[in-house]
């Protein structure tokens, strides 16, 4: 399922600018989730011509090319709203939470071995398997807007990577926090006087 968000408040064009000023940035710990040979690492382009603060990321001068387009800006084409790999990972999480370790392992293996045929099968069980599923969601669904919902659903603290330095107060949030609830879009509030903005916005 795909949707074009160009011209809307949810357009990702400015999140993936090829100049290096996009808001979606690769971190060292995310990159390390994937082993050598994993094709998902190829969504990151290292470019010494990048400008701006993102040219000096600890990972190196890198930009996200997950949604490349043929125009002058990345992110102007349709993006996936839901795809099969997310469905597998949703089922893997449900199976792991229900104690069906074999089923969860099989679902994660489908995703991991598609991206890296040489990777070993998942052998973790119990709590360690839940962590494997969570990390696989983070690797596979990166830069698609899922992680904040995953953290919220698991009632976890938000702890950004060690290379989070530009806005220190946003690097760590303890759960619960009103910032885990997203703001209501201005368009919705402006069109209905009975709607009240969520706390903190």
Model-identified regions with their sequence ranges:
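Extended, hydrophobic/aromatic-rich amphipathic alpha-helical segments that build helical scaffolds
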Residues: 6-8, 38, 79-108, 130-142
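Short, contiguous acidic/charged loop-to-helix segments that flank catalytic cores in large enzymes
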Residues: 75-79, 118-125
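Flexible, polar/acidic helix-loop-strand segments at domain edges
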Residues: 30-82, 159
